[in-house]
Amino acid sequence: MTAGDVVERIRKNVGVPWREATYRDTFKAGGPATPVTGIATTAFASFDVIRRAVAEGLNMIVPHEVTFWNDRDDVAVVKGDPLYTQKIDFLTRNNVVVFRMHDHMHDQRPDFLYIGSARELGLDAKHETAPGSHRFTIPETTLGRLAADVKKRVGARALRVAGDPNARVSRIQLGVGYATPSVNDAAVDVVISGEQQEVDGGFDNPEYVLDAAALGIPKGWIMLGHAVSEEAGMLEMAQWIRGFVTEVPVRLVKAGEPFWAPK
């Protein structure tokens, strides 16, 4: 089985028209003729992920995010960087092929990234107010207890929370990656999201939450981090690929959280 065979099966099973002009969902290292010994899905193909995948005998990596630190994986802008030289040399020496899956994952309905994140957070479908809304109603709790539960579930080292920890909340809006739901929605108490700007947003920044807390209005924001919010979706991706690629092992190799907080 070659990497091209795997990609062809992905295209056949993805369930949405393939974006032929995509610059994201393409080969980033190696190519379609590369023989595949195993497949690793991951949030992003860091050097550590690549090294662990190779150690596990998985030479095809399917990351959701970039490999060479820019959205287009444009090697022209990094060619003189010593990290690029070492990374591409390691990929080449170990016959590793990298094929990104980003746009078509988000095009799918339901979106694997949301399925995985909701599952990891314990937000069952029975709690979702409407299919595909990513809005959930849970038994009332405090923002502090909810944040502690989220931290435990995702294993985050650097979880960030805005809002009064004693605020009573039950209505959650989920966003993954760069998705930034508006926290001013009257039907939302807490936004749980991935990556978030801190200023200049449109009702999607922590200042609104701080003002709500000062006025005694229950609002909260829990920021997981981009990779943390989407990694569970790459487990869903691995399970999906296993459904039509049975010749080689397919599993998640976690990129993990890039940030940490000093104690």
Residue ranges with predicted function:
Residues 1-263:
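Hydrophobic structural segments
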